Structure formats: C-alpha cells, structure tokens
UniProtKB/Swiss-Prot annotation:
CDD domains: AAA. Interacts with mug40. This is Checkpoint protein rad17. It comes from Schizosaccharomyces pombe (strain 972 / ATCC 24843). One of its GO terms (biological process) is telomere maintenance. Pfam families: Rad17 (PF03215). The gene is rad17. It is found in: Nucleus. ATP binds at residues 112-119.
Length: 606
C-alpha cells in the first residue's frame, strides 16, 4: 500500500526537481527563437546556417577594415620571380649567386636608386628557392623607466654584436654521406643568408663609418657559416648648401663601403637601374585590374603621366596611382559611394573611405576643407598636359645625366639639320643595306660642318648663327647633385668627344680654364663658385658644335670614385681651416701617394 506523502515531503521533492531544471545547459538557438528553457535537441538546421552566415559576415567585415587603409605597394607584393618588374639578367645574377654560395664570394652588394626592386627581388628569390634570411633591422633606442641602463649599447655596437653572433654561433651543421660539411645550412638542410636591408646610421666624424667597414671586413675574412646580402640605396641630393653639401648629402657605395672593400675579390657588386616604363605600365595595369577599376582613355593617360613622373621609382608610382584613384571618388560624388555601399559598383575601401571623409567635410563649413580646396587650386595645374605634375617625384637628374645634357648641346632645329645631312650623305647606301664605317661617318660630319667651322672663327657671326638652346642651365645645375668644382671637372673629362675640330676643343678648354680661375678655394665663396659653374656651362654650350655628332659613347668620370675615398682623409683639416671645399676633386687618387698640406696662413705671418 502506497504511503501518502506529507505536505512537507511533497514540497521538498518539488524543490529538488526545480533545482535540477535550473542546472540544465542552455541551448544555442537563433536570435528569433531564443528560449532559456529549451533543450539542445530543439535547434533547427536553419538556425545553424543563419548563425554560421552571421559569423562569416563578421569575419569579412573585419578583413575589410584591415585592408581599408593598406597601401597598394604592400598589398600587391610579388610572390613569384616572374612577377618582378626587374630585368631578367639581374634576377638570374642574384639567383645564380645564391645557388653557388661559395667562399670565394662572401658578400653580394646590390646598389641602385629607391623603388627599383632590390629588397623585393632578394626576398622573393629566397622564398622561391626555399632559403631563409637572417635580417638585420635597426632597433629603436627605448629605455625602460625602471631600468635606465637596459639599453646602453650604441647602434654600431649592436650591429657588430649581431654580426659576431651570426658568425660565431651558427645553427647546427650536418654532415652528408661523403662527410663533406654543408655550408650555410641548418638542421633541416635549409640554406640561410645574412640580409642587410638597413644599415646603421653612419658618420665619419664619430667613427661609426670606420667601425662599420671593420665589421664587414671581419665578416669577409672569417669562416662563418652564412654569406651576406647587402642592399644599398644610392642617393644624390641637390647641392643647395654650398660647402661640404656634396659630401654630406651623397649616399653611394663608394662613400659607404670604401674603395678597398669594393675591389675585394670576395665582394660581388650588382648595380640596379630604375624600373623601365614598360615594366612599370604592366605592373600598374595589373593593380588596376585587381582593384576593379574600369579602363578609360583618361586612366591610360594618367598611367602614362605617372610612369614618366616617377623617374623609375615603382613604389612612388604605385602610391601616386592610389592617391589619384582616391581623388576620382571625390570628383564623382555621392552616387558612386551609394553604389559601392549597395554592391552595385566596384571600388576599393581606401577610395571609399577617402570619398566619405571629403563628402562630410564638403557639407560642413569647415575651415580645413576651405584650406584644402585653396591648396588644390593653387598647386595642382588645371591643364590636361600637366595635371599629374603634383605627383612628380622630387629627384635630381643624376651626375651623368646632367653632364650629358651639356655635352650633347641640344638646340632647336637639330632634327631638321640631321635629316637634311642624312639625305645629302650616305642615306642611299643605308637604304641598300651597305654599312658605313665610323671613320666615314666622322668624315661626313666634318664635311657637313665646314661652313660652321668658318663661322666659329668669327665671334660676331657665331652669335648670330647659334639656334636657341634646349638646355635649362639653372635646373641642370641644381638637379645634378654635384658641387660646382665637381661639375666643371665632369665637363672637362667629357667635352672632347663632342668637338669636331681642334678650334672647338681649344675654345671649350680655354673657357673651362677661365671659369676655374673665377672660383676661390680660400676664402671659399659660394656665390663665386655658382657664377663660375654658370659661366662654364653656358660657355661650353656656346662653343660646342650644333648639332653634336650623333654616335654612341660612354661618359667618363674617373676621378669621382677616387675623390670620395681620398677626400675623407682630409675632411677634418679642411673643415677646421677652410682651405678648400670638401667637395673639390682630389687629382692625386692613389692612397699611397703623399699629399702636401696647404701652407697655413697663420704660420706664414710669423
């Protein structure tokens, strides 16, 4: 017989049941059908799909936020050697050096201007070959408040320690079946290289430059496990500071490494050139296709102008293209922004964000936006021909380019004169396929210039016979990156090949001698040096023949490399006493040759 429960027992048992219900696990359901008391078996398949779709949307939005402000040159880094905008010979040279990796060549020095793909080529080839790079990065000098002595080493000392650790403590080296030591490989057989993409801040006055050279020299002589790949960006800045400006602003392989290291047989030097326009157009076109930008004649013109204005710097061209595309969203207005939001139009997140900010500023009476509009109207030309000059890279002409503009002496009407001369001499022979020797071409040029040589003897007739020059003297001198004395020395080495007669060579040589006498070494006068350089350039352009015989030749500047080496020995003495400009060329180029010091005017007074 079932015993009847008392009221106390029944209430106690009901409380236990309620407690058991409370500790049940809550179920995962969709937002529309949430119920805390539902069990796990109540979840439907539609709810699981909705939950996963919502999760994917959140991940996609996070990725968009990360890529919104990403620069294109970082977003579209080449992943294969075939995608590099570098000449195939340069790529094959780096690849062959990395595959060989012999003790006879311990250092690969890659030099070139900025944005020509030096570091990218090394990283892509290392990844493609399965090699790893031990990269040196300049550390930040940060000190903890609790420990002020935690970072007492200088940057040069840190670099020396890094190189010594790489050479002293390499990874485990294995032996193959023939007991031959595998050089430069780790325990997994993966080859490694020391990659110096950045170098410490160097100065010859505090000894850091000499310390850097000693570290590299020690690494070459040691029998370490890893070879070294160094990337050096060469810079030639405008000479606008007068004395010592060329020595302090220049940044090339000769001044950093030194002549003894560059001539070392264990050092391989590879010179990179600026990116060719064909490679640059191909790269920019690929980026535009990936970004979904539609083709148009205006876009093609924009790419052409950016390629011509970037001076072979691919990184600068990509940044200019990204900035130009972002400005196009501002001109199109709110319609494109709405289309991109609704998914009807194509566009990148960076351009969308920039257009939204500009739209918000344009609707408000903001002083910043007013200044922005005034800035655009003042500094961006409105003509179609120069509409992209705002993105032009501020670079110099370069040493050889500036000297070449002078010695080639281009004037108005040169093409017509050359065309008329080709019709008068040997043009019929070239049509038939008969080659003309260089001596015959020189004789033809001399015969064609006979009337000009007669006019050169009379100065009055010479003034009236010269056509207008196409060389801008001021921009050529300012963008050469050379001091006045070095620029005059470059003209002195290269003017002879442009002359046809001895009279022309005599006149140019006499004028360069007079211009050299106009400048003073002590006391140094920047105005006098500038006037002397103007006089030498203008006189050389005046006395050279027009047109200059068109033939292939290589410009020479033999003393430039030696100047950077020998000049460093006497920098301190020249700066203190002001005897001469540090940037003046030193004719005595041999290091073992003893140079006589200039007489001290203070000692002469005694």
């Amino acid at each position: 017989m079932r015993r009847q429960l008392s009221f106390h027992e029944s209430t106690k048992r009901s409380l236990k049941k309620k407690k058991i219900r409370k500790i049940e696990k809550p179920s995962l359901v969709s937002k529309t059908s949430r119920d805390k008391n539902a069990s796990i078996t109540d979840i439907h398949e539609e709810d699981i799909e909705a939950f996963s779709d919502e999760e994917n949307k959140i991940v996609h939005l996070n990725n968009l936020k990360e890529d919104r402000f990403q620069l294109w040159f970082e977003k579209y880094i080449p992943q294969k050697a075939a995608d590099l905008a570098v000449h195939k010979s340069k790529i094959s040279a780096i690849k062959q050096w990395m595959l060989t990796d012999s003790l006879e060549s311990r250092l690969l020095l890659i030099c070139g201007p900025s944005g020509c793909g030096k570091s990218t080529a090394v990283q892509v080839l290392a990844k493609e070959l399965g090699y790893s790079l031990i990269e040196w990065l300049n550390p930040m000098n940060l000190k903890e408040p609790s420990n002020q002595e935690s970072d007492t080493l200088s940057l040069t000392e840190k670099f020396s320690r890094f190189m010594s650790l790489c050479e002293t403590y390499p990874e485990l080296e294995l032996m193959d079946s023939n007991n031959i030591q595998k050089r430069g490989k780790n325990a997994q057989g993966k080859k490694k290289f020391i990659f110096l993409d950045e170098i410490p801040h160097l100065s010859k006055f505090n000894g850091s430059l000499d310390a850097f050279r000693n570290v590299i020299r020690t690494a070459l002589t040691s029998r370490g496990a890893f070879s070294i790949i160094m990337v050096l960006t060469e810079i030639q800045l405008n000479n606008l500071e007068g004395i010592n400006s060329q020595d302090r602003n220049s940044f090339n392989s000769v001044q950093i490494m030194g002549n003894d290291l560059l001539q070392d047989p264990r050092v391989t030097v590879l010179q990179f050139n600026p990116i060719a326009p064909t490679y640059m157009k191909k790269c920019l076109g690929s980026i535009l296709r990936k970004e979904g930008v539609p083709k148009s004649p205006k876009l093609l013109s924009l790419v052409e102008n950016i390629c011509s204005a970037s001076e072979g710097d691919l990184r600068s061209a990509i940044n200019s293209l990204q900035l130009s595309i972002s400005q196009s969203f501002e001109k199109k207005g709110t319609k494109n922004i709405r289309e991109v939001k609704e998914g009807k139009g194509k566009g990148n997140d960076f351009s969308l964000e920039a257009a939204q900010v500009l739209e918000r500023l344009s609707k408000s009476d903001s002083e910043a936006y007013a200044r922005f509009k005034n800035y655009k109207s003042a500094y961006i030309p409105k003509s179609d021909k120069n509409e992209n000059s705002f993105f032009k890279k501020d670079v110099g002409l370069g040493m050889m380019h500036a000297i070449g503009k002078v010695v080639w002496n281009k004037r108005e009407g040169d093409d017509e004169v050359l065309k008329a001369s080709s019709q008068q001499t040997g043009n019929s022979e070239r049509i038939k396929g008969v080659k003309v020797s260089k001596s015959q071409e020189n004789k033809n040029c001399i015969s064609l210039k006979s009337d000009q040589r007669e006019r050169m003897l009379n100065v009055d007739q010479c003034f009236t016979s010269k056509r207008r020059s196409l060389v801008d003297i001021e921009s050529t001198i300012n963008q050469s990156g050379l001091s006045g004395s070095v620029f005059r020395y470059g003209l002195f080495e290269n003017y002879v090949d442009s002359c046809v007669t001895t009279d022309e060579a005599f006149n140019v040589c006499d004028l360069l001698s007079i211009s050299d006498c106009l400048s003073h070494d002590f006391p140094y006068s920047y105005t006098g040096d500038e006037i002397s350089t103007w006089f030498s350039v203008q006189g050389t352009l005046f006395y050279l023949p027009s047109p200059v015989p068109r033939k292939w030749r290589q410009l020479r500047f033999q003393q430039w490399n030696n100047e950077g080496i020998v000049r460093g020995i006497f920098d301190d003495y020249m700066v203190i006493y002001g005897k001469r400009s540090v940037s003046d060329p030193v004719i005595e180029a041999h290091e073992d040759q003893v140079l006589e010091d200039i007489d001290d005017p203070i000692e002469d007074e005694d």
